[in-house]
């Protein structure tokens, strides 16, 4: 489920954005799935991916962010073989989003290195 995001920035001769940027008021959220918006379901138990329920507060918050025009991309440790069940689950629970990235390495020792400020939030 993806919606076109309006980007700002200079255009090339074809009218395409060069190094596109989000407007300053738009946040770009990168959200984990398991243990963050639903119970922690390991890849070894894919049958639970179908039946787990999203956390109500997470549903409300993500819907608000999406409706406010922010970008929601899920970044999950689920593998590509879990993509279809994950997309079905997101649709079943009416979770709107812009992108789904699979294959995040498991573990909690994440470091994001960028030339811009990166803000990390623990979603509780």
Tell me what each language-model feature is.
Residues 1-124:
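HAD-like aspartate-dependent phosphatase fold
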């Amino acid at each position: 489920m993806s919606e076109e995001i309006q980007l700002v920035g200079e255009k090339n001769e074809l009218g395409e954005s060069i190094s596109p940027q989000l407007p300053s008021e738009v946040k770009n959220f990168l959200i984990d799935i398991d243990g963050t918006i639903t119970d922690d379901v390991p890849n070894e138990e894919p049958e639970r991916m179908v039946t787990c329920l999203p956390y109500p507060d997470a549903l409300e918050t993500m819907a608000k962010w999406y409706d406010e025009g922010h970008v929601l991309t899920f970044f999950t440790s689920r593998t590509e073989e879990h993509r279809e069940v994950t997309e079905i689950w997101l649709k079943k629970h009416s979770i709107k989003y812009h992108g789904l990235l699979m294959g995040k390495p498991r573990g909690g020792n994440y470091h994001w290195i960028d030339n811009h400020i990166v803000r990390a939030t623990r979603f509780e």
